[in-house]
Swiss-Prot record:
The keyword ATP-binding does not apply. NCBIfam families: rnpA. Coiled coil: none annotated. Pfam families: Ribonuclease_P. It comes from Chlamydia muridarum (strain MoPn / Nigg). It is an enzyme of class 3 (hydrolase). This is Ribonuclease P protein component.
Amino acid sequence: MHRLTLPKSARLLKRKQFVYVQRCGQYCRTDQATLRIVPSRHSNIRKVGVTVSKKFGKAHQRNRFKRIVREAFRHVRPNLPACQVVVSPKGGTLPNFGKLSADLLKHIPEALPLVTSSK
C-alpha cells in the first residue's frame, strides 16, 4: 500500500514552474476546474500547483478549494503518469472531492499523449 503524502517535492512552488506549465501545458476543462498538464522529464515526478484568483471568493473559500485539490491529487498521485499539473477553479462553487479525484484520474492520462504528440 502506498503511503499517501504530498511533500513539498510534489508541489509546484516557484513562479517559474507555474509559468512553464501555463505556457507549455495541454489545456483541459472539467466541470469543476481547469487543468494545465505537462509531461514530466523524470519518470517518477508528479507535481501539482493550484492557482485561485480573488474573483473566486473570500480567502476561506480560496483556501478550501486549494485543500480539496491537494487532497484529491494526494489520493490519485500513485495512479498518475509522470506529469506537472496546474489546477484553477471554474466558476464560483467549491468542487466535490470525489468528482475532482475522478476527473484528475480521467483527464490527465488523456491529455498527456496530446502534449507529447504536439511537440
